[in-house]
Amino acid sequence: MKSMPFAPIADLRVAQLIDANLDRAREGLRVVEDWCRFGLDREELVMTLKDWRQRLGRHHHDSYKQARSTATDQGIGLSHPAQQERHEPWHVVAANCARVQEALRVLEEFARQPDPQLAASAAAIRYGLYDLEVTVLQANAGKKRRQQLQDCHLCLITTSQSDLNSNDLLRTVNAALVAGIDMVQYRNKEASDLQRLTQAKELASLCRKHGALFIVNDRIDLALAVDADGVHLGQDDLPTDVARRLIGSERLLGRSTQFLAQLQKAEAEGCDYLGVGPVNSTATKPERQPIGLAYVKEASKATQLPWFAIGGINISNLEALRQAGAKRIAVIGAIMNSKDPAATSLQLLEALR
């Protein structure tokens, strides 16, 4: 690694300080880089972080390293109780982003006169890291959503007839969430936009409280407005590439399919999950011809993406679906019209396990 032109600093204390903060910044960048590499599989972030490390390395002159005095450094071995609270990978990443930003700021201040090239590089990297940290946070959220999606078994889709004013919608969904459903898809074709927004906000809050995914049907604007985990689209809705551009790469994108070619197209276009159905006749879409179990069997062999069988599913016909290869189901009436939505949800979940 070729060093930048440099005249040694006369003040030993400043040289030691710069050496320590170069070490701190480079080490912290490596921690973030490795998470982007192994945890997020984001090559473009890895390359950016690697470039920043190497740029700092070119400023890490021998005279700084020779000023190092580990034996007399009063900060050696010091720790903070907060370090024991980093239970998730993102906690480690966030702590190291902050560590790097602080180290770079110190370098800017103390290297401005004796090593202006280092100060300029530190400033540029610090501002770049502010933006990259947000990108990593979003990527981490997307990774978590997709992992959670893999573990989903039962998705509740709401009905347009539910009335928020009587608390039926919230009460029913909350009961199902308490029972352990993994995912809620908000669907309301009849309400005004203002009522949809109010309902979606309430449901999104409920889902966050219970650790469940919250998806909005059709309406990307509504999904973004309430910070939903994703959006579900039908065959006549926006093309996948347009939808992805609007919602970003870190939110989930689902697509309804009625036959194998649609499934293959949705998978090739980058959808995160699929709806397979309607398996049976439904009151929600009475005009839609049911596909029966044949397509369910095809889907079970055709894709590794998570997919949900949908359409007139209840406890009485669930076993036949399981035998056909369905591991996940989406239901509407079975729970929304139940006198005991919690008990029905538990019954369906137990049958899926």
From Swiss-Prot:
Annotated CDD domains: TMP_TenI
GO MF annotation: an example: magnesium ion binding
Residues reported in the UniProt entry to bind 4-amino-2-methyl-5-(diphosphooxymethyl)pyrimidine: Q185, Y186, R187, N188, K189, N217, S256, K285
Positions contributing to 2-[(2R,5Z)-2-carboxy-4-methylthiazol-5(2H)-ylidene]ethyl phosphate binding: T282, A283, T284, G312
EC number: 2.5.1.3
Reactions it catalyzes: 2-[(2R,5Z)-2-carboxy-4-methylthiazol-5(2H)-ylidene]ethyl phosphate + 4-amino-2-methyl-5-(diphosphooxymethyl)pyrimidine + 2 H(+) = thiamine phosphate + CO2 + diphosphate; 2-(2-carboxy-4-methylthiazol-5-yl)ethyl phosphate + 4-amino-2-methyl-5-(diphosphooxymethyl)pyrimidine + 2 H(+) = thiamine phosphate + CO2 + diphosphate; 4-methyl-5-(2-phosphooxyethyl)-thiazole + 4-amino-2-methyl-5-(diphosphooxymethyl)pyrimidine + H(+) = thiamine phosphate + diphosphate
Matching Pfam families: ThiD2, TMP-TENI
Gene Ontology biological-process annotations: thiamine biosynthetic process; thiamine diphosphate biosynthetic process
Residues binding Mg(2+): D218, D237
Name by which UniProt lists this protein: Thiamine-phosphate synthase
Organism: Prochlorococcus marinus (strain MIT 9313)
